[in-house]
Amino acid sequence: MKKKIKYNRILLKISGEFLSSKKTFNINTIFITKLIKQIKLLTNLGVQIGLVIGGGNLFRGSDLEKIGMRRSISDKIGMLSTVMNGLLLHEFMQTANIKSKIFSSTLLEGICERYHIDKAIKCLEKKSVAIFCFGLGIPFFTTDSAACIYGTEIKANILLKATKVDGVYSSDPILNKSAILYKNLSYKDILRKELKVMDYTSLILAYENKLPILVFNMYDPEILYKIIIEKSNIGTLIK
């Protein structure tokens, strides 16, 4: 029997830290291979995927600022890191025979195609994965903010925010074993409880554009499939 698909178009946000490893040139090929396998399964089911990848495994603008760099420059270095990660995933997808196209918010001729909403939509409709790089192209905005903007522009059914824990907790579950996992939250709940999900700019962007967010544990090798076929009790849904 054909599985019922809950989300036909998604925006997947993955932290660059997932790509990092102490082995194999600092690239976590095991994680990437599993991710590509999940993406291929979803595209075969007809799911349209937009992907925003962070750059924290290489450079993080806020960290570079701590060593004396101007934030306007350090953020650009961080944004360039997302381009490198995007190219990495793009190449892995090509090897796996997954159609994909990499877009940049700024002109990077010969490396990425300049982002335009119509081109991105056309890419998705052709069953290609659209990889969005270089954030929003301006400093002081995170890749979470970029994910919310791109998710809104491509009219994604949901923003899937991959994390290393099972969802949103009352406090850090790694430090506090008694932390409570929330299954459903409103955007206002996040702000009122001061929960650490994403920066508030990103959260407000999602709230104003009515973009639901699902926070989940990316280390489950079948998690994207479970989310897409509407398996219950996964992660924390924010709307």
Swiss-Prot record:
Catalysed reaction equations from the record: UMP + ATP = UDP + ADP
Subcellular location: Cytoplasm
Pathway in which the depicted protein is active: Pyrimidine metabolism; CTP biosynthesis via de novo pathway; UDP from UMP (UMPK route): step 1/1
A GO CC annotation given for this chain: cytosol
Keywords carried by this UniProt record: ATP-binding, Cytoplasm, Kinase, Nucleotide-binding, Pyrimidine biosynthesis, Transferase
One Pfam family per UniProt: AA_kinase
Keyword Lipid biosynthesis: no
Highest taxon of source: Bacteria
Record-listed ATP binding positions: K13, I14, S15, G16, G56, R60, T163, Y169, D172
Subunit composition and interactions: Homohexamer.
Its job: Catalyzes the reversible phosphorylation of UMP to UDP.
NCBIfam families, per the entry: pyrH_bact
Protein's name in the database: Uridylate kinase
Source organism: Buchnera aphidicola subsp. Cinara cedri (strain Cc)
Source taxonomy: Bacteria, Pseudomonadati, Pseudomonadota, Gammaproteobacteria, Enterobacterales
